[in-house]
Every structure is written in C-alpha cells, then in structure tokens.
Design a protein with these regions (language model features):
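SAM-dependent methyltransferase catalytic region
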Residues: 2-141
Length: 141
C-alpha cells in the first residue's frame, strides 16, 4: 500500500489513484499543446536522494521547481526535508514552485497541505517559469 504523508494530510492509495486518473483524463491534446509531462514519484525520490545530505540539513537552503506541475517533486522534497526540519519551516521557507497551468498549481498546493493563511501558499505560483521574476512574496502581482 502506498501512503504519502504531509504535515496536514495523508494521501492514501485511493487518492494517489484518483490523481493518476485525473492526469489521464487531461488527454493527449493538452500534452500536445503544453508539452506537459509529470515526473513519476519514484524518480522524484531518486533525484531528491541525490542531493547532498549537508544541503538537506541546511535550514537556509532553498529548492525551486520552476515547472512544478501538480507537485510531485515538491511533495517529495517536503517528505525528505521533514526528516531534518519542521514541516512548517520546509513549506514556509525552503520550497518553491512555479507552473503555467492554474489547475496544476491548485493541485500542488492541496497536495502540500497549504492554505491561503500559510506563508508557503505564496511560494507556489501560477506563472510562466521562463519569464517569472522569482520574487516569492505575500502579495503576488
């Protein structure tokens, strides 16, 4: 059984399957027009485990996914960084995401357990990752 845990919620096997089904429903058209491809969770974990441990332990480190999709890499970062830091600190000070598709940003925030009251809410934004100014503040314009 696959269970992923964040600081505020659990993602059960059923929830993971629901997310997979949603992605399939997006259809080939969206993939053709946007080039949208999601990195599988197991590959995200392998990539994050390649980050040097001293960087993972650094409470001042920042991690950016400039094409975050629905948050696979961000969720994996949250899981691994929470082994070293308080999950609130990870969400509010360490991880950042940008994606062009608004529904992906919404899903990523939900998967991270973010609410509009959280500082980290403003660290996952809907924007063009190639032209965004990369200033993550509480008043996004």
């Amino acid at each position: 059984m696959l269970t992923m845990t964040t600081n505020k919620s659990k993602m059960s096997t059923t929830t993971v399957q629901t997310e997979i089904d949603k992605q399939k429903k997006r259809g080939r058209n969206r993939v053709k027009t946007t080039g949208e491809v999601f990195t599988p969770m197991d590959l995200c974990m392998r990539m994050v485990r390649e980050i040097p441990e001293e960087k993972l332990k650094d409470a001042d480190a920042k991690f950016l996914d400039n094409s975050c999709g629905d948050g696979n890499f961000l969720v994996t970062l949250l899981e691994v960084l929470s082994e070293y830091h308080d999950p609130k600190h990870v969400l509010n000070e360490m991880i950042y995401g940008v994606d062009l598709m608004e529904d992906n940003v919404t899903t990523a925030k939900e998967r991270l357990g973010l609410t509009p009251k959280d500082k980290g809410w403003h660290h996952v934004v809907c924007a063009d990752g190639l032209s965004y100014n990369y200033e993550f503040t509480e008043s996004i314009t």
